[in-house]
From Swiss-Prot:
The family this protein is said to belong to: Belongs to the major facilitator superfamily. Organophosphate:Pi antiporter (OPA) (TC 2.A.1.4) family.
Cellular compartment(s): Endoplasmic reticulum membrane; Lysosome membrane
Glycan attachment sites: 58
Functional note: Unlike the other SLC37 members, lacks glucose-6-phosphate antiporter activity. In osteoclasts, forms a transporter complex with ATRAID for nitrogen-containing-bisphophonates (N-BPs) required for releasing N-BP molecules that have trafficked to lysosomes through fluid-phase endocytosis into the cytosol.
Post-translational modification summary for this protein: Glycosylated.
Record Gene3D superfamilies: MFS general substrate transporter like domains
InterPro entries xref list: MFS, MFS_dom, MFS_trans_sf, Sugar_P_transporter
Taxonomic path: Eukaryota, Metazoa, Chordata, Craniata, Vertebrata
Region (Disordered): 240-261
Protein name in UniProt: Sugar phosphate exchanger 3
Length: 494
């Protein structure tokens, strides 16, 4: 098999300028900060739960129970835990709805404005939710739900915008490697959020929210003044213009349209002619693009599992093994480390094969067995961290790949070549559908855990991972068949 052109003689690195590096870093850290603020909430759940429930007794004063309970939301830790799961669900549902809207807005307004507004506004809401309410000793379930709905809508501006900006600057050559490495932004944000939360948690959970909100607000200001959303802003040719000018430009990895006398076409592109559009495509048109619906449904199942680890892993470690909250926060970082390595390595392999679905399928198959192994992890931090890293590799890696490289492929496939106003919409559809699945999943996780225990939660994860494979099965079959035909043709030519 011949190596892709971008891997030969360092062609990929030489095609990048300092503008590409600046865009890579700014979008990377902007989404990292958004994820850090989300991670803060999951990392302080135990502290919040204690604050929202009354103490069993108080030896300093002998007062009636109603006095001690007057400033608390719930009579028991179990009810507080269930409400925390409800908040996760509320956030993800509003986040999912916001993704569909933000994708459309991002394709019609300046991406820099939308991203900066979302970051700064979300930071303010997080400050009010976690810090101001605690300083004022104001506890109200409906107020918390309302704030978290608004936060979900504001946070949804992030992913479609950053993926669209990256798609404007980085072409299909080496997209798996570049986006695989870049998609580690979510995992880096999780690590950053865990470290920030654990470092100030001893002073009170409100300071964890204060620190992450402040850093995120500052990041939004930097994005507003420093981000270039496309090469055209500084007089450089667009990615589409550069790629169309190359005589032997690479075939899109989601695109199965081969040369006319070549092999079986991929599932994702079924027309030979590119339709050139000028205006932003509609939501319905984006949904009808080949490959969008299968990957969206698959991502609904996969993101459910990935976000369950994101929201519940520190709580699981504290609840199931009795480890201290700060220790559980730091240990949960290893899941994100596995996701970073997995996303980058899987992206590289998919670039070499020039196909995404087979790589995704193999990783998800191994993810099932990694979930089985992690569910039986002993009460040993070293072994748990190792199994957690492996699980993150096979769950977080494919999740990063679908939400970044594959979404970019879908939004820039040949069927809509010449239209740069589709990427944010397509990304919003894929990630929005995934977030709906994740939203339903978070509430189910809390119910399953409360009634059946943690082992049944892992059985549920295994089922959802298997469903992910089923939804993209037609793409897997077509792309594997295409690879076999290519291999046979290569052997005949030799």
């Amino acid at each position: 098999m011949a190596w892709p052109r971008f891997l030969q003689r360092g062609a990929l690195l030489t095609s990048f300028s300092h503008h590409h590096l600046a865009v890579f870093l700014l979008t990377f850290f902007s989404y990292s900060l958004l994820h850090a603020s989300r991670k803060t909430f999951s990392n302080v759940k135990v502290s919040i739960s204690k604050q929202w429930t009354p103490n069993a007794f108080n030896t300093s004063l002998d007062l009636p129970a109603e006095i001690w309970s007057s400033n608390h939301l719930f009579p028991s830790t179990e009810e507080a835990t269930l409400f925390l799961g409800t908040l996760d669900t509320v956030f993800l549902f509003s986040y999912a709805v916001g993704l569909f809207i933000s994708g459309i807005i991002g394709d019609r307004l300046n991406l820099r404005w939308v991203l900066s507004f979302g970051m700064c506004s979300s930071a303010f809401v997080v400050f009010v939710f976690g810090t101001l309410t605690e300083w004022l000793h104001f506890y109200n379930k409906w107020f918390y739900c309302g704030l978290w709905i608004v936060n979900g809508l504001l946070q949804s501006t992030g992913w479609p915008c950053v993926v669209a900006v990256m798609g404007n600057w980085f072409g299909k050559a080496g997209r798996g490697v570049v986006f695989g490495l870049w998609s580690a932004c979510a995992s880096v944000g999780n690590i950053l959020g865990a470290f920030l939360a654990s470092s100030v948690l001893q002073y009170g959970y409100e300071y964890a929210f204060l620190v992450t909100a402040s850093v995120q607000f500052a990041g939004g200001i930097i994005i507003f003044f420093g981000l270039l959303v496309s090469p055209e802003e500084i007089g450089l040719p667009s990615i589409g213009a550069e790629e169309s000018s190359e005589e032997d430009s690479q075939r899109p990895l989601i695109d199965g349209a081969e040369n006319e006398d070549d092999y079986e076409p991929n599932y994702s592109i079924q027309e030979d002619r590119a339709v050139v559009q000028v205006k932003a495509i509609s939501f319905h048109q984006a949904c009808c693009l080949p490959g969008v619906i299968p990957y969206s449904l698959a991502y609904a199942c996969l993101k459910l599992v990935n976000y369950s680890f994101f929201f519940w892993l520190p709580f699981y470690l504290s609840n199931n093994f009795g480890w201290k909250e700060a220790e559980a926060d730091k240990l949960s970082i290893w899941y994100d480390v596995g996701g970073i390595i997995g996303g980058t390595l899987l992206g590289f392999i998919s670039d070499v094969l020039q196909k995404r679905a087979p790589v995704l399928a193999l990783s998800l198959f191994l993810a099932v067995w990694s979930l089985v192994g992690y569910s039986r992890s002993p009460n040993n931090k070293s072994i748990n961290a190792l199994l957690m890293t492996i699980t993150g590799f096979f769950i977080g890696g494919p999740s990063n790949m679908v939400s970044s490289a594959i979404s970019a492929d879908l939004g820039r496939q040949e069927l809509i070549q010449g239209n740069s106003e589709a990427l944010a919409t397509v990304t919003g559809i894929v990630d929005g559908t995934g977030s709906i699945g994740a939203a339903v999943g978070q509430y189910l996780v809390s119910l399953i855990q409360d009634n059946l225990g943690w082992m049944w939660v892992f059985y549920f994860f295994i089922l959802m991972t298997s469903c992910t494979i089923l939804f993209i099965l037609p793409l897997i079959v077509r792309e594997v068949f295409s690879l076999v035909q290519r291999r046979q043709a290569h052997s005949l030519n030799e």
